[in-house]
From Swiss-Prot:
Residues that hold FAD according to the record: 33, 41, 46, 86, 120, 286, 327
GO MF annotation: an example: ferredoxin-NADP+ reductase activity
Cofactor(s) required, per the database record: FAD
Record keyword Flavoprotein present: yes
Alphabetized UniProt keyword annotations: FAD, Flavoprotein, NADP, Oxidoreductase
Name of the molecule in the record: Ferredoxin--NADP reductase
InterPro entries found in the cross-reference section: FAD/NAD-bd_sf, FAD/NAD-binding_dom, Fd--NADP_Rdtase_type_2, Ferredoxin-NADP_redctase_2
Sequence similarity: Belongs to the ferredoxin--NADP reductase type 2 family.
Co-factor binding details: Binds 1 FAD per subunit.
Enzymatic reactions: 2 reduced [2Fe-2S]-[ferredoxin] + NADP(+) + H(+) = 2 oxidized [2Fe-2S]-[ferredoxin] + NADPH
Origin organism lineage: Bacteria, Pseudomonadati, Pseudomonadota, Alphaproteobacteria, Rickettsiales
Source organism per UniProt: Rickettsia canadensis (strain McKiel)
UniProt EC number: 1.18.1.2
Keyword Transferase recorded: no
Assembly information from the UniProt record: Homodimer.
Length: 337
């Protein structure tokens, strides 16, 4: 059995920043993640997706953000338990014992759940024979955007993923169609502004008021995408790639059986320190829910700092935290004093 101060469930960007923040407070961390590598959705789903709302980075791709967060956490020597899930929780006095799907046992005083969407998978459009095209012409995630160079692409959806990828791929694709059932997008206002500018210049064609209806092609090679409007009028889009971005299916898995207050696949927390209904267990990032919650990586970073600040006295048996700015803990060379 491993003994540590904090167990962090989830090695996405928020979980990785929590490792750094815990290290700044002198806490040792073990991290559990179901994926084979760290990074969460940023690596598994969209490593090349540009992110625009990380402070000091006008633009950074998801993969690079994860690399920087890993480097930031590395001095504190976290222990990663990858390709395994946290499946069992037991309370032993002031300690928690977690068992993973690989029978790893970890004992800690604090648990930080930063599991993002939990176990996730794409919401697939209900199109006949779509599985025949998956992996060849239909993709739900993008790990190498260069393979779409010169292609005619239909992107479906109105959220951040659909809009941001339409903008990004317009630089290399021959043609981009963005299909959305209405003229209102849920992506960030700045992304929508860029999208409409590109539509005005002809770089992107907006197909508004339509939904996906059928696929046409042979042997997994797409030739066209059929869309229809509310009056059942159809329109054919000549394309060899379809990228449907309709969000993710969430599944909390074993976490749902831990006695936590769960609502619609999210864990309810207080909005001061992000503690759950079980003292010593916190939830941060996309998996956490409270009044006024914003699902932004930046907000998750702040939740990590607040929750670990609050957890300090539990880890160190009632000792008060003497708050210091990071500049007082590191020298000019960036090394810990």
């Amino acid at each position: 059995m491993y003994n540590t101060d904090v167990v962090i469930i989830g090695a996405g960007p928020v979980g990785l920043f929590a490792v750094f923040q815990a290290g700044m407070f002198g806490m040792k961390c073990h991290v559990i993640d179901a994926q084979e590598t760290i990074g969460g959705q940023c690596i598994t789903l969209y490593p090349e997706k540009p992110i625009y709302d990380i402070p000091a980075y006008p633009k950074i791709v998801a993969e690079e953000l994860i690399k920087q967060l890993e480097l930031q956490a590395a001095p504190f020597k976290p222990v990663y338990h990858l390709n395994q899930q946290a499946i069992e929780l037991n309370k032993q006095g002031d300690f928690f014992e977690i068992k993973t799907s690989k029978n790893t046992l970890i004992k800690s005083k604090i648990i930080i759940i930063a599991a993002g969407a939990g176990s996730f998978g794409p919401n697939k459009p209900p199109l006949a024979n779509i599985e025949d095209f998956e992996g060849k012409s239909v993709f739900y995630f993008i790990n190498d955007k260069n393979k779409f160079t010169g292609k005619n692409i239909v992107i479906a959806g109105g959220g951040d993923s659909a809009v941001d990828w339409a903008i990004s791929l317009s630089e290399i694709a021959n043609k981009i169609y963005l299909v959305h059932r209405r003229d209102k997008f849920t992506a960030s206002p700045e992304s929508v502004r860029q999208l409409r500018n590109l539509a005005e210049t002809g770089k992107i064609e907006l197909v508004i008021g339509y939904q996906l209806n059928a696929l046409d092609g042979n042997n997994g090679e797409l030739q066209s995408v059929i869309v229809r409007d509310l009056q059942n009028n159809t329109h054919k889009l000549e394309a060899n790639i379809l990228l449907p971005f309709f969000g993710l299916k969430q599944n909390l898995g074993s976490l749902a059986n831990w006695g936590l207050n769960v609502k619609l696949q999210h864990i309810e927390v207080d909005n001061s320190y992000y503690q759950t209904n079980i003292e010593g267990i916190y939830a941060i990032g996309d998996i956490a829910h409270y009044t006024g919650k914003l699902k932004l990586i930046l907000i998750g970073f702040a939740e990590a700092a607040s929750s670990l600040h609050h957890a300090y006295s539990r880890v160190f048996d009632g000792k008060a935290l003497h708050f210091e700015y990071s500049t007082t803990k590191y020298g000019k060379n960036g090394k810990k004093k």
